[in-house]
Curated annotation (Swiss-Prot):
Membrane-spanning residues: 43-59
Active site: 172 (nucleophile), 418 (proton donor), 421 (proton acceptor)
Gene: XOAT3
Provenance organism: Oryza sativa subsp. japonica
Protein name, UniProt field: Xylan O-acetyltransferase 3
Name of the top EC class for this enzyme: transferase
A cellular component annotation (GO) from this entry: Golgi membrane
Function: Xylan acetyltransferase required for 2-O- and 3-O-monoacetylation of xylosyl residues in xylan. Catalyzes the 2-O-acetylation of xylan, followed by nonenzymatic acetyl migration to the O-3 position, resulting in products that are monoacetylated at both O-2 and O-3 positions.
Keyword Signal: no
Entry comment describing in which tissues the protein is expressed: Highly expressed in leaves. Expressed in roots, stems and inflorescences.
Length: 455
């Protein structure tokens, strides 16, 4: 999609000046140019031949070498981005509440990337490719009331990530945010030096030049459940084990940044099916009030963090509620159908919307985070800002059971419109902008070049 002509913002809000664009990175070094020449020479073929000969002759002795591609030996790591030479990053003061503000129309600095240019996007969130006729949802910048968010600088961020692992843990909304982050960083990475590997509960994006990974791990309840297979699960059959977490949590060890969420999977019923202690069958379960079960899960989760996470190495974040927009009367459109045909945010507001969130769950997580003793948990409050974005969901321009909606399904939006997930580029980019701000606001230990997941 080519960039549209300068569009006139809706006459609802006074716009603030857009944030300045990221600074231009320094030029590549002469050694990079030399290596580029070598790649076009017979030296490449010679190195490859020796590599294959070693594999043939020594087999097990070069197993770890075989896990890397030839490119890992011919291509250097990314040149260090001289962050210290840039103007100081203007970060908001710790006292500024980033969750309170307004959406400002901005077709100058947004979108942060183009849908068609991010080949890693899944069909689920590729709304333009799926036929959405409007694109205004991409052009809204979040402006906190008393400060400003820094523009996401992919090179500055990846320097922070050099040699490190970041993992989003939770449900498909955390995957939505993970996809956004991949699209934000991938333009600065060399072709052939970035890829996604999907394996079981993992989706792993490898940024080879930085020896870094951005990962998503499927655990919709955080604890163990009968829905832990990311591809096969049923809404009406969800059963959880609130005190069992190890099968998931063993995969979270030695990760540098952990970003958790869990909410939407809890919202189908007031009571949750809970597997009985010491049971060997998922059919052996009780029904327990939702908030009670949620509390048990977070006791298990927080205990695991306190016992297994080294706060000197690992930073822990928790994303608050991402809203559903299923009841248009809540934003003054009683004749609407869910979020269908919504093209603008809620702009003229004087108080928060009431979207029927279970705020007991929000408050419970906030209390758990506040009471952590050894491992700080930073809450990233995305709820109110996202409440106003009734326009930005995938709606009828998504997939169901792996396929685009049929005309017959689109004719029944009450049943088939997805007002949970978000089009990309879009709202999750702002979530990542806040995450970026939080990470850069904190000092972090130097890279230890940990062992990354096998590719």
């Amino acid at each position: 999609m080519s960039k549209p002509q300068q569009q006139s913002p809706p006459s609802t809000t006074t716009t603030s000046p857009p944030p300045p664009p990221p600074s231009t990175p320094p030029p590549a070094s002469s050694s990079r140019s030399l290596l580029s020449a070598l790649r076009r020479s017979p030296v490449t073929t010679l190195v490859a031949a020796f590599f294959l000969l070693a594999l043939f002759m020594y087999g097990e002795d070069v197993r770890t070498l075989a896990e890397l591609s030839i490119d890992d030996y011919l291509y250097p790591d990314a040149d260090f981005y001289n962050v210290s030479a840039l103007p100081p990053l203007l970060l908001p003061p710790p006292t500024c509440d980033l969750s309170r503000g307004r959406w400002v129309f901005d077709n100058t600095s947004l979108p942060a990337y183009r849908e068609k240019e991010c080949t890693f996007l899944t069909k689920q969130v590729s709304c333009l490719a799926n036929g959405r006729p409007d694109d205004l949802w991409q052009y809204w910048r979040w402006q906190p009331n008393n400060c400003s968010l820094p523009t996401f600088d992919a090179r500055r961020f990846m320097e922070k990530m050099r040699g490190k692992r970041m993992m989003f843990v939770g449900d498909s909304l955390n995957r939505n945010q993970w996809e956004s982050l991949v699209c934000l960083v991938q333009p600065i990475l060399s072709k052939g030096r970035k890829k996604i590997v999907k394996r079981g509960s993992f989706n792993i994006f490898y940024a080879k030049e930085y020896r870094a990974t951005l990962e998503f791990y499927w655990a919709p309840f955080l604890v163990e459940s009968n829905s832990d297979n990311p591809n096969f699960h049923h809404i009406d059959q969800r059963i959880i084990s609130p005190e069992r977490i190890e099968s998931h949590a063993n995969n979270w060890k030695d990760v540098d940044y952990l970003i958790f969420n869990t909410y939407i999977w809890w919202m189908n019923n007031e009571d949750i099916k809970v597997r009985r202690p010491n049971s060997t069958s998922w059919s052996d379960h009780d029904e327990v009030p939702r908030i009670e079960t949620y509390g048990r899960v977070f006791k298990t989760w927080s205990t695991w963090l306190e016992q297994n996470v080294d706060p000197a190495r690992t930073s822990v974040f928790f994303m608050t509620i991402s809203p559903l927009h299923n009841s248009p009367a809540q934003w003054g459109n009683p004749n609407g159908i869910k979020c269908v045909k919504e093209t603008l945010p809620v702009l003229n507001y004087t108080k928060p919307l009431d979207l029927n969130h279970d705020m007991r769950m929000y408050d419970l997580v906030a209390k758990v985070a506040k009471n952590m003793k050894n491992v700080p948990v930073s809450l990233i409050d995305i709820t109110r800002m996202s409440d106003y974005r009734k326009d930005a969901h995938t709606s009828l321009y998504s997939i169901r059971q792996g396929k685009l909606l049929t005309p017959e399904q689109k004719a029944d939006p009450q049943k088939y419109a997805d007002c949970i997930h978000w089009c990309l580029p879009g709202v999750p980019d702002v979530w990542n902008q806040i995450l970026y701000t939080r990470i850069l606001s904190k000092s972090s230990p130097p890279s230890t070049h940990p062992s990354l997941p096998p590719q």
